[in-house]
Amino acid sequence: MTKLPYALLDKGSLLVASPDVNGGIFSRSVVLVCEHSLNGSFGLILNKILEIDLPEEIFPLDHFDESKVRFCMGGPLQANQIMLLHTSPDSANSSIEICPSVFLGGDFSFAGEKEGRTRDDKMLLCFGYSGWQGGQLEKEFLEGLWFLAPSSQEIIFTDAPERMWSDVLQHLGGRFASLSTIPENLLLN
């Protein structure tokens, strides 16, 4: 995996927080960029997992292997809004493909449909989102607050989201691999 230059930032890229991002929701976060333009950017934090149970009336999981459904804090903006990332190509008519085999769709009705669904479909329900005004993300990138990495379905739906930050840095190699070993609490170093 090669670090990407800022000029290649686009939908489907991963923003990996620098160790300099200290504290707050973006500390050690990995953000999937869902939209990027001159007007601004929006993405979803993938590795801030929430341990919650949604009532069956809100989100029916009977057609899913519950181990393939995760809840996370997508970002600090509009935390009451739920964004849905999934691997179900059959719902692509109501979804946007963010990167190969990863779709963003806000309509939960397909979750209850059996047809075309396999128990291997993976889902990530993100509460809230992350957003930047035009030029803001570029400024943060130039200040060294973010690294850019390519994404994949395997990274986004990893079985070990708590290790995603260090795993992505390891895959970037070089100095990034050594950054991945920095303890979260430097007093423990």
Curated annotation (Swiss-Prot):
For this UniProt entry, what's an example GO CC term?
cytosol
Q: Which Pfam families match?
A: DUF179
SUPFAM superfamilies the record matches: VC0467-like (SSF143456)
* InterPro entries per the UniProt record, alphabetical: AlgH-like
> Which family is this sequence assigned to?
Belongs to the UPF0301 (AlgH) family.
Write the protein's name.
UPF0301 protein CTA_0231
What is the species of this protein? Answer: Chlamydia trachomatis serovar A (strain ATCC VR-571B / DSM 19440 / HAR-13)
